[in-house]
Amino acid sequence: MAYNKEEKIKSLNRMQYEVTQNNGTEPPFQNEYWDHKEEGLYVDIVSGKPLFTSKDKFDSQCGWPSFTKPIEEEVEEKLDTSHGMIRTEVRSRTADSHLGHVFNDGPGPNGLRYCINSAALRFVPKHKLKEEGYESYLHLFNK
């Protein structure tokens, strides 16, 4: 899936730009996907690259969408020492978008919680994966 990063960045709304380009954080419980339950794929709002699946989403009660793991190598982790804290930042590899942070207080075997800003994501419903060019990810929902 080809994209023009500069053009896509120009089309972002204020919150999407602040989060993805300026490492911002949207307000908890006041964002699009924190309690979203539909089956599908969460992709990078800038590049369109798949990041997370609804199968790995869980209710962490933190006010942001939370996932136990990314679906492929598109997610990078970097040390973040901003705001007087030591955290692990999560960024998209292709667009270098700030997505959120990963913490070691999650459920499941890996114990991770990927706390992601909704503004960094676009949701593609399972029934539209083929239509939008994500057909190769349909197998993730058959497990």
Curated annotation (Swiss-Prot):
PROSITE patterns: MSRB. GO terms for molecular function: peptide-methionine (R)-S-oxide reductase activity. Keywords: Oxidoreductase. Its EC number is 1.8.4.12. The active site is at residue 115. It catalyses: L-methionyl-[protein] + [thioredoxin]-disulfide + H2O = L-methionyl-(R)-S-oxide-[protein] + [thioredoxin]-dithiol. Belongs to the MsrB Met sulfoxide reductase family. This is Peptide methionine sulfoxide reductase MsrB. It comes from Bacillus subtilis (strain 168).
